[in-house]
Curated annotation (Swiss-Prot):
Keywords: Hormone, Secreted. This is Motilin. Residues 12-22 have a biased composition (Basic and acidic residues). Residues 1-11 have a biased composition (Polar residues). It comes from Gallus gallus. The keyword Nuclease does not apply. GO terms for biological process: smooth muscle contraction. GO terms for molecular function: hormone activity.
Length: 22
């Protein structure tokens, strides 16, 4: 996996996934 995402972008994506779960 190539980390072409920034740490902040990863956190935003994770938050979106959590919102989908809810």
């Amino acid at each position: 996996f190539v980390p072409f995402f920034t740490q902040s972008d990863i956190q935003k994506m994770q938050e979106k996934e959590r919102n989908k779960g809810q």
